Amino acid sequence: MGRTLENKQQIVTEIKSLLNDSEMAVVLDYKGLTIKEMSDLRSRLQTTNGICKVTKNSLMRKAIDGDSNWNDLESLLTGTNAFVLIKEDVGGAVKAIQSFQKDTKKSETKGALFEGRLLSDSEIKEIASLPSKEVLMAKIAGALNGVATKIAISINEVPSGLARSLKQHSEKSES
């Protein structure tokens, strides 16, 4: 027995909600993947705040209809698709997908949409090579800490230099 109209509307509403919270969508051809392999992909994506959703292309079309951020996704809606919706750690999620594909050698990336723009395969690979948000924040914090340390040393050096000059001057006066 097929899905009811109400059930389909709930699915479309859920997909719209997921898309509103997502920064990027990656479309995978999941043909030939087992349930265990799909579960493996989902668990890999969990750490990066990504969600793998398998739904009919017609329901995805209804979900993106009228949404300018996701309209270009329509060109990828053919065949058997799994949609990876990424909320935060885009680079980490793309790395997880590529690692999964390397391990299973079954699924292919059909394409991705980021900030309303379709990405080429090379652009998707570039995103995977980016450091995570935590690494970038650590680098910025380290750079800021280095600047603060240099300023503190410079500020401390002025009175120290003055004290050395006064000491030398007093030693000259005593001799």
Curated annotation (Swiss-Prot):
Pfam families: Ribosomal_L10 (PF00466). One of its GO terms (biological process) is translation. Keywords: Ribonucleoprotein, Ribosomal protein, RNA-binding, rRNA-binding. CDD domains: Ribosomal_L10. GO terms for cellular component: ribonucleoprotein complex; ribosome. Gene3D superfamilies: 3.30.70.1730, 6.10.250.290. GO terms for molecular function: large ribosomal subunit rRNA binding. The keyword Ion transport does not apply. HAMAP family: Ribosomal_uL10. Belongs to the universal ribosomal protein uL10 family. Forms part of the ribosomal stalk, playing a central role in the interaction of the ribosome with GTP-bound translation factors. Part of the ribosomal stalk of the 50S ribosomal subunit. The N-terminus interacts with L11 and the large rRNA to form the base of the stalk. The C-terminus forms an elongated spine to which L12 dimers bind in a sequential fashion forming a multimeric L10(L12)X complex. This is Large ribosomal subunit protein uL10.
